[in-house]
């Protein structure tokens, strides 16, 4: 915790092609070793693959995928009287999108397709169709929160 008060949130610029801040955040999340150009090329190629295979606007498919990935609830460990309880809490809007992007990139990297472009494209298409590993992660998170509903009164 800094002494000078809370740190201001840095705002990202929208990407040049789709004019979307969410796409910029996905590019940043995919970026490895500061290679933004490579990350952009991978994502735009993935969007081209989505457009070819679905025949729809890739931005619409991506937004639908993000809606299906972003969690509403999560559990947070809370220590009460020597015991740790998993307390379900609602997820803030900024954290929802951060978790959604993180899960999307992580599970795209774990896929078996040959190139990252295809992995990202297939993960986004799967998420838009409510299938895929990133959607399963969201469902598991919701199940954990539902299973621990009894401890919801420990919310702070």
Curated annotation (Swiss-Prot):
An example molecular function term from Gene Ontology annotations: mRNA binding
UniProt feature coiled coil, ranges: none
SUPFAM superfamilies, alphabetized: Ribosomal protein S7
InterPro entries on file: Ribosomal_uS7 (IPR000235), Ribosomal_uS7_bac/org-type (IPR005717), Ribosomal_uS7_CS (IPR020606), Ribosomal_uS7_dom (IPR023798), Ribosomal_uS7_dom_sf (IPR036823)
Keywords: Ribonucleoprotein, Ribosomal protein, RNA-binding, rRNA-binding, tRNA-binding
SS bond list: none
Pfam families: Ribosomal_S7 (PF00177)
GO cellular component terms, A-Z: cytosolic small ribosomal subunit; ribosome
Keyword set includes Zinc: no
A GO BP entry: translation
Subunit structure: Part of the 30S ribosomal subunit. Contacts proteins S9 and S11.
Family label: Belongs to the universal ribosomal protein uS7 family.
HAMAP family: Ribosomal_uS7_B
Function: One of the primary rRNA binding proteins, it binds directly to 16S rRNA where it nucleates assembly of the head domain of the 30S subunit. Is located at the subunit interface close to the decoding center, probably blocks exit of the E-site tRNA.
NCBIfam families hit by this protein: rpsG_bact
Name of this protein: Small ribosomal subunit protein uS7
Organism: Listeria monocytogenes serovar 1/2a (strain ATCC BAA-679 / EGD-e)
Phylogenetic placement of the source organism: Bacteria, Bacillati, Bacillota, Bacilli, Bacillales
Gene name of the record: rpsG
């Amino acid at each position: 915790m800094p002494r000078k008060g809370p740190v201001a949130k840095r705002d990202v610029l929208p990407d040049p092609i789709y004019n979307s801040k969410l796409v910029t955040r996905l590019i940043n999340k995919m970026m490895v070793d500061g290679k933004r150009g490579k990350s952009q090329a991978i994502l735009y190629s993935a969007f081209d693959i989505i457009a070819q295979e679905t025949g729809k606007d890739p931005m619409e498919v991506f937004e639908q995928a993000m809606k299906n990935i972003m969690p509403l609830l999560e559990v947070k460990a809370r220590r009460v009287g020597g015991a740790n309880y998993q307390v379900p809490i609602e997820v803030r809007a900024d954290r929802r999108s951060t978790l959604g992007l993180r899960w999307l990139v992580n599970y795209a990297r774990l896929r078996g397709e040959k190139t990252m472009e295809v992995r990202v494209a297939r993960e986004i298409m799967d998420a838009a169709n409510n299938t895929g590993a990133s959607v399963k992660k969201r469902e598991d998170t919701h199940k954990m929160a539902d299973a621990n509903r009894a401890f919801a009164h420990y919310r702070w």
